[in-house]
């Protein structure tokens, strides 16, 4: 709700919305919208606090669940939005409150199943750069979102420093903000790190201390140099995004991570008493690769997954499909 109010104040394009703590008022707001309806828990809900309800009945049931504590304190307040039709992308800005550096756009895959089916997750894979975000659209996001938000926050006495995650929907009317996060995305961060040409720590330190200077860090990720495509595929434990089954042994990770351009980031892993890696969370591994083109990066990532001895692992087989098609 705070973010939506700031966007309204600064003229940043986003979906029409309302904020509610009362079921009756929330149901009344549904009368002003047409299905599908977007319902968001106002607080942090591990990436699962957004529900797209296809019918009025589903929306009413879901909003009642949320306001009665489905996500604990995170859904004590509910944001209801009009549905935006389009393709989504993630844009990351690193800023000290005045100066900023925009990273290449990434695109993640929220649904658990191939073809974007099944329930929402924290993200089952990502790739960058995302072709849907053309240079023209990136410029519009900078002018219509990044600059107004940073200037507005600073002008209101609360300059924003750090990583600003801008979730954008590319609609027929242009880019509109779906959400902001005060962090990198997971798994988008993994692909962006693979594209970095130098250590990102000095940039983050400069952002946090207000010491960024224009163009000082441009060599980290030259926007005009077409950074190599990168992809990450999340391998999850069975049961995710519900209750994940923990404890299954994962073998051959060392060998699998030695392919050209491949890096495996651990997420939900642990070591058992014998020193074996085991599944210890929902999203367990991020198998990440770069390539001369996206197809090569995708092939490398899936080849690495094929080397991992973990039959219980669950993953999508179509990461990057929008760009590849």
Residue ranges of predicted features:
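Conserved N-proximal alpha/beta basic substrate-recognition cap immediately N-terminal to
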Residues: 1-16, 25-31, 37-38
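Short, conserved charged micro-motifs
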Residues: 25-26, 58-61, 242-244, 292-299
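Conserved anion/nucleotide-ligand pocket segment
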Residues: 34-56
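Short amphipathic alpha-helical segments
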Residues: 47-49, 231, 281-286
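Internal nucleotide-binding/catalytic subdomain
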Residues: 49-190
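Short beta-strand/turn micro-motifs at beta-sheet edges
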Residues: 113-115, 219-221, 270-277
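Active-site "cap" helix and flanking loop/linker of ATP-utilizing ligase/carboxylase catalytic domains
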Residues: 142-164, 181-261, 272
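Generic C-terminus detector
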Residues: 269-274, 278-325
